[in-house]
């Protein structure tokens, strides 16, 4: 799952996701996808910089976007039914907005947390030489890594894709579905470094 948002705030009092995309896989290959643009009744404005980076198109979202109440049941069904939920920086960002969406509809999100696999955390752990040990809790490991800072550790999706020589259209990143397609390729490189 990946969310494109108005800004980097981690809750709905200042931010919402205007695009939420999901890819279903067999562990290696894409089987299905959902790509939602969401229209919110909100006073939030996206900055010109954020519009440029994410290619946010307000008229497109207004014309093609769905109401949150129409997309949440599908998102919930996919996430609740998933064995794992893989995302790049999902521990540090996306899960907070997913949590807010679950809360908005009176649902609990906590059962999702043990399913989270964050490719950013995995890559950072490898680069910082803090490997995951099978005897430790994987969720706790990821939270420890996301909160460990080291200079010079490059783990953005673009950096990892290029480091792994992955063929991808990098100019289209920050479209959630395009990000997920690259993240699946990155995951297919990183997963062999783990013993889950």
Descriptions of predicted regions:
Residues 42-44, 122-125, 176-177:
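A short acidic, often aromatic-flanked loop/helix-cap motif at beta-alpha or helix-coil junctions
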Residues 100-105, 125, 129, 163, ...:
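Active-site catalytic microenvironments for nucleophilic, acid-base chemistry
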Residues 138-151, 161-165, 177-196:
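Acidic two-metal-ion nuclease catalytic site recognized across multiple nuclease folds
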Residues 1-111, 149-164, 174:
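Conserved non-catalytic scaffold segment of RNase H-like nuclease domains
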Residues 3-5, 119, 180:
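Generic detector of well-ordered alpha-helical packing
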Residues 116-149:
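Short alpha-helix plus adjacent loop in nuclease-associated cores
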